Regions:
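Conserved P-loop NTPase "ATPase switch" module shared by AAA+ and STAND
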Residues: 60-79
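Interdomain hinge/linker elements that couple catalytic modules in large macromolecular machines
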Residues: 132-313, 321, 332-335, 340
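Short regulatory helix/loop adjacent to the ATP-binding pocket of P-loop NTPases
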Residues: 103-119, 131-136
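Conserved catalytic segments around the Walker B and adjacent sensor/switch elements
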Residues: 21-36
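Conserved lysine of the Walker
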Residues: 11
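Sensor-1/coupling segment of RecA-like P-loop NTPase cores
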Residues: 89-110
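A cross-kingdom feature that marks ATP-driven nucleic-acid transaction machinery
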Residues: 1-2, 6-8, 17-23, 251-431
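Short glycine-rich substrate-engagement loop in P-loop NTPases that contacts/grips substrate
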Residues: 32-64
Length: 431
């Protein structure tokens, strides 16, 4: 199995913790010269396994109770090609590899073990995991009751407010849980963000491409509230092709992803790559740090208007992305680009034969013009608004006269969107 995810989302810590359940735990870190050299000079998997077994005093009969962890596997094409032989020659030995920026190495790996590997994906902590990290188990249990009750709502809103500001990077959350001191976090953000900047440019094919990537990571945060154009991105002179290629590298690294809209109102969700995309950072806390708005956010009672209304939609998309642990899929949004009636719905959720529109608004008074355009075209009467209020369901009508059902959800329910949609459709028998 390969555990995939951006740097510093907790892959190594997670596998090391899991390794405690085995009698024997062997770790190779391919960023360390000694471990990398061991792999490179091994002529076969048999030779490597025999050496590791001898070094760690393990016999073949112990393999079922042994976990071999190969960390930073993106550093070695040979290690990746070895994975198929672990599967074929030592099926009783448990092997987990972890890596970031894997796409770049996989392109160059000749003997890639297709069909021999399972993938799991790891993301920054979502809100549920953030509550669990704080030991808020009773509140988490109330969160998981569908629908959530009014008593828990205020406490959940307060916790989500802080989560929106600091984000879900494990080192950040661990520090905050231990010290409850937001002033101690900027140095950690700086270290994490600089690591990402240094990492991604390693995979540029030329100095010119490196410069484009540097420009993007230094300016992209300012454009999270809008759809982008590649040509002259960030007020530069870079051409569309240059920027597109650089964004592809950043997207593969999961540091800054490019999200394309769809225009259909029925499944399947089909991204339209001719339309202008929008950007999704790995973590909203890093985004807030890069925008230098965390101090301002601390003073706000309601984050719905934070940074031109972009922060809450960004964190909700991050929440939805975090659920893709076995099959990585980007989030989707819907657009209608017409001169007289353009529209944009923040999020689409596929549910059976329906595409469910999710609009993210500051309150019940916010305009639902775009949502209404989707509802008018959709073959079902179902829509969701995520806002800063309590859970409720209302029967309403679009300005064009189409009756529909609107489920209003508090912002903090991003990871439970599918459960609520299922609850709603079941309750109202909308099939």
């Amino acid at each position: 199995m390969i555990l995939r995810g951006a740097r510093q989302v907790g892959k190594t810590t997670l596998v090391s913790s899991f390794g405690e359940s085995y009698t024997h735990f062997i770790e190779l870190n391919l960023e360390k010269c000694e471990d990398a050299s061991l792999v490179e000079r091994s002529n076969s998997v048999q030779e490597l396994v025999n050496f590791l077994a001898l070094k760690n005093e393990i016999s073949p009969k112990d393999f079922p109770n042994t976990l071999l962890f190969i960390d930073e596997i993106q550093e070695s094409e040979k290690a990746i090609s070895f994975l198929r032989y672990f599967y074929e020659d030592f099926p009783e030995l448990n092997v987990i590899a972890a890596g970031s920026l894997l796409e770049h190495t996989l392109k160059k790996t000749k003997n890639y073990p297709v069909g021999r590997i399972n993938y799991l994906y790891l993301f920054p902590l979502n809100f549920q995991e953030y509550l669990e990290a704080q030991g808020k188990n009773n509140l988490l249990e109330r969160f998981r009751n569908v629908p959530v009750d009014d008593i828990a709502h205020e406490l959940l809103m307060k916790e989500f407010h802080t989560y929106c500001i600091i984000g879900g990077m494990p080192e950040i959350v661990a520090n905050y849980v231990a010290n409850k001191d937001l002033l101690s976090l900027p140095q950690i953000y700086e270290s994490i963000w600089n690591t990402y900047k240094d990492d991604v440019i390693k995979y540029a094919d030329s100095k010119s491409e490196e410069n484009v990537m540097k420009h993007i990571v230094n300016t992209a945060a300012s454009f999270v509230d809008q759809r982008i154009k590649f040509q002259n991105f960030g007020h530069s002179n870079y051409k569309s092709r240059e920027v597109s290629k650089a964004f592809n590298n950043l997207d593969a690294a999961k540091v800054i992803q490019v999200i394309y809209p769809c225009t259909n109102v029925e499944p399947p969700i089909l991204p339209d790559y001719k339309k202008s995309p929008r950007l999704q950072f790995l973590d909203t806390g890093i985004l807030n740090f890069d925008l230098n708005i965390q101090a301002d956010l601390l003073l706000m009672k309601d984050l719905s208007e934070a940074y031109k209304g972009a922060i809450i939609p960004h964190i909700i998309n991050q929440e939805v992305l975090s659920l893709n642990t076995t099959d990585y899929k980007k989030t989707n949004f819907w657009v209608r680009d017409k001169t007289q009636s353009s529209a944009e719905v923040d999020l689409l959720i596929a549910h059976g034969k329906f595409l469910i529109p999710v609009e993210i608004k500051s309150g019940k008074t916010g305009s639902l013009k775009s949502l209404h355009q989707f509802v008018n075209q959709a073959p079902h009467p179902f829509a969701v608004r995520m806002y800063g209020g309590k859970f409720n369901i209302e029967e309403t009508v679009t300005p064009e006269g189409k009756p529909y059902l609107l489920m209003n959800l508090p912002y903090y329910l991003g990871t439970y969107l599918k459960q609520y949609i299922n609850y709603f459709i079941t309750k109202y028998n909308v099939e």
